[in-house]
Amino acid sequence: MKKVAVIGTGVIGNGWITRFLANGCEVVAHDPAPGAKERTIQAIENAWESVEQLGLKEGASKDSLTFVDSIEEAVKDADLIQESVPERYELKHGVLKEIDRFAHSNTIIGSSTSGIKPTDLQIGLNHPERLVVAHPFNPVYLLPLVEIVGGEATTKEITNRASVYYESLQMKPMVIEKEIEGFVADRLMEALWREALHLVNDGIATTEEVDKAITYGAGLRWAQMGPFMTFHLAGGNAGMRHMLEQFGPALKLPWTKLEAPELTDELKERVIQGCETHANDRSVEELEKKRNEFLVKLIDLVEDYWP
Amino acid sequence: MKKVAVIGTGVIGNGWITRFLANGCEVVAHDPAPGAKERTIQAIENAWESVEQLGLKEGASKDSLTFVDSIEEAVKDADLIQESVPERYELKHGVLKEIDRFAHSNTIIGSSTSGIKPTDLQIGLNHPERLVVAHPFNPVYLLPLVEIVGGEATTKEITNRASVYYESLQMKPMVIEKEIEGFVADRLMEALWREALHLVNDGIATTEEVDKAITYGAGLRWAQMGPFMTFHLAGGNAGMRHMLEQFGPALKLPWTKLEAPELTDELKERVIQGCETHANDRSVEELEKKRNEFLVKLIDLVEDYWP
């Protein structure tokens, strides 16, 4: 992959451009908004020091960027196309149809959509099979996660190829097999976000207090582990098995506006086995030691950089 | 504050003991379980290197710990009492009544409960006014957050005094004025947790994938900022105002099992004003610069410590 087209240059599109440039790609961008090019150049300028610190690939240059006046011109020779126009179905779908019309038939089109199902985006395309969702996280040039979701027309070969592409951009692709609105990461984030809005709406906490409740608590742990391994470590030596016994009943309590699933034996086993497999023979004590070393450094880091 | 009583020595109680010792307190502990003392000594041993790295207070010593055989003996001369018995109302309430009976009438009792309302815990106490929830986060000896929640009988003077106590333990106390089940931090965590269980239950993602979706994405940002400031920075120069325009409509979409509140003009303004006040005249660009410096270091740190 050498030449990448980026369609739509808002915060996300510009984040992609920076990542592509930092990884030695040649980028052709298109956005019809007045002043788009200048804003993109400024955005790259602001981000460049950070990507340099993380490490540039050979041949990486801020100058390998061209702005063109049409989608056709942007996509016609591209090896990968990244669509990042605003999150409105009609707009996105129209742009994707135009991309599809002018791109090589086997060029992968990645859509940055946060939650629209790829099957819905594939409707009416000439080559729907090469469209995947490739959903990144802000700031795109730093955060490694990208969710790869195929639609009904997408083949396994395409999601695999897409996964390899994005991995070559120093990302952590996560292929999601079952297509649902919001995919995986945004479902988790959106649950937290909606609960946070309820807390503010009900006058329980200010936005600053909600942020404080995360940054000085769970947020520190989630940087290293997600919710499952975090709870595995909170369960003492018996890990998640003990945790579910201890806090399973809380799933029935009004601790959030979100109804929990029934904690069946099957779900319990799935969660416990998942954590134990992930722990991979490392005892809770061993994992705790690693976590503690990490947290000590992270707490120092947070002190230096926030508020 | 010099002498602290800790009642209940599971993962949380032992975390408290370590924090108290690291901050130069003398600790008297009680737990009727066989082998409790040995487990506590081991837990302190495992954690001590980390608290040393974060910095011990003058006079801090692992040896300033005594185990005693009764609640009476533990609490009678204490300046602060921390209750951390298992999360079952009847058990906690019984223990708190016994603590209340033997403690000095003006000694603050902090309950580590994750979600039981302090008003419910105060029922039948001789001096209910000095009972507050002081809810910590695992690992208690490292994570700074502690939620302070008073019940109906609690005076403002007591929550203030409690707040000063916990702050002197190098913690970040957050006083929550409105008493609700789950308080603030656990409501947020529980929303994420329940959504995560739904994803696993519905076969959308494995526990490992859920964890990956957090650790390589939002988790990195949440270590430094909570959900509100994170979105403020994702909104470009117009910050949260733009973000709500862009992603407000997504609140109606099935991106989580949790119903969102109505995004009224009042709620919008509350959220926007909250973020702008917190940003405190720092532009989004300025905050982004700080965030990027932080993320570069954090990403390096995560590489070193996980998996």
Curated annotation (Swiss-Prot), chains A, B:
**Catalyzed reactions:** carnitine + NAD(+) = 3-dehydrocarnitine + NADH + H(+)
Which enzyme class, named as a word? Answer: oxidoreductase
The question of whether Secreted is a record keyword is answered with no
Pfam families per the record?
A: 3HCDH (PF00725), 3HCDH_N (PF02737)
Q: What keywords are assigned to this protein?
A: Cytoplasm, NAD, Oxidoreductase
- Metabolic or biological pathway, per its Swiss-Prot or TrEMBL entry: Amine and polyamine metabolism; carnitine metabolism
Q: What is its EC number?
A: 1.1.1.108
> Which residues of this UniProt protein bind NAD(+)?
G8, T9, G10, V11, I12, G13
- Which GO cellular component terms are attached? cytoplasm
Q: Does the keyword NAD apply?
A: yes
| Subcellular location(s) per record | Cytoplasm
According to the UniProt entry, its GO molecular function terms are: carnitine 3-dehydrogenase activity; NAD+ binding
| One GO term (biological process) | carnitine metabolic process
User: Could you say which protein family the record assigns here?
Assistant: Belongs to the 3-hydroxyacyl-CoA dehydrogenase family. L-carnitine dehydrogenase subfamily.
Q: What does this protein do?
A: Catalyzes the NAD(+)-dependent oxidation of L-carnitine to 3-dehydrocarnitine.
Assembly state and interactors? Answer: Homodimer.
Q: What is the protein named?
A: L-carnitine dehydrogenase
Species in which this protein is naturally found: Oceanobacillus iheyensis (strain DSM 14371 / CIP 107618 / JCM 11309 / KCTC 3954 / HTE831)
